[in-house]
Structure formats: structure tokens, C-alpha cells
Amino acid sequence: MKKSILAVAVAAILISCGPKPAAVSLFNGKDLNGWTAVLEDSTLHPSTEFTVEDGAIKINGSGMGEAGAQDGGDLIYANKKFKNFELEFEYKVDKGANSGVFYLAQEIPGQPIFISAPEYQVLDNANHPDAKLGVDGNRQSASLYDMIPAKPQNAKPFGEWNTAKIMVYNGTVVHYQNGEQVLEYHLWTPQWKEMLDKSKFSKEKWPEAYDLLINCGGENHEGYIGLQDHGDDVWFRNIRVKEL
């Protein structure tokens, strides 16, 4: 299995520092305690958009996939901002569903959460049109959305659970999917700026997003973890974070 330099370095640091920090559950499997809905449509209500079903957070869509999708907003874990961490979760999507997991997100008045944060893409690759857009599959599941494709692309079909992990340490970020490392990149570097310049978040295409993302995490390089409501049925469970 491919192993990130970051993962090796973090492991060495943790060993040298004594006992490993314990992972903390962000979701108790029963209710949405600790989570806050940020809705873009005033006609929507948090209690119907986000529910708990069989021990999982369910984002409730139209049931019509892309044809009936309506962007609902985001669900953020509002109890704490995270800086260096390892986030693990499981997800599954309905047919044609689109969602994502945000990290280092900021609350910006008048702006949706997602424009301030990198996104671990969550998608039904086989049935959502976004899978064929972007460049080289960089809008498929586990990709850094619209910037880096997840390789290998090992997402399971809709209706099946996937395991996922995001590791962030001093600006180095690694995405994992179903037990495999699928990408690595470095925030706040010339590489990061170059990726933004080539994406839908470029200064020319989306200046508000660019200004936030170029220094994502803000002055302290920390932020919220969030789940995207893109108008489709998606489930998340076993959401755990370990601070590094």
C-alpha cells in the first residue's frame, strides 16, 4: 500500500511524544448534537434537511438525483475548529448523488461555507454528470474537488458504504478512500496557488472563493469540518477525529 511521507512523519512524532491522542467521535449516532445547519434556501428547515437514520447522518435530497437536486447548504460540526488532525468517516450515496466533506472551513457572513474550504468530493461516479466534468476525473469521489483527482479511483457503487480518511498536518493534506491513499497536496504553497488558478475557484472565475481559499483556515490555519447538502440523499456515519 502506498504510504504518505506525512503519515510516516506523523507516526514518528506521535511515538516520540508518548501515548497516541485518542480519536473523538463527532457524531453520537442518535442525534445531531454539536452540529449546526447552514442553509442557503430560507424555505428549507434543518429538521427535514438533516436527520438521523440507522445510526447515520442522512442528508435528505429530492429523491430525484441530479434532475431534482436543490442545494440545501451545509451541516458543520460547530463545537470546535480543527488545525492538525486525522478525520475518519464512512459514507454512502444514493443513485446520482453528490456531496462532499469540507475541512478548515470558515463562517463568512453572506457566503456559503463551501467557498472557504477544500472539499473531499463525495459522488456517485457512475451516475452523476459531474464525474465526467473537470479535468482527469478531479470531480470524482475522494478527489480534492476540481483540483486533484483521486487515484486509484476505488469508490464503491451507490448504496454501498465507503471508508474515508483526511489527514491534515502543518499544511500537508492526504485523502484516503477504502483503505488506499488517493492523493496528497500542500496548502499555502505555490502548488496550492497554481491549482486554484486552474480551477473553478480562480481569481478570474470566482474571486470571492479565491480570496478565501488562497489562505484557507484563516490567520490560525484552522477551521470547521462540514458536510455538504447538494440536494441528494447521502449518509455519513462513524465520524471520528484525532487531533495531531
What would you call each of these model-derived segments?
Residues 1-22:
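Bacterial Sec-dependent N-terminal signal peptides
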Residues 17-244:
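Carbohydrate-interacting regions of secretory-pathway proteins
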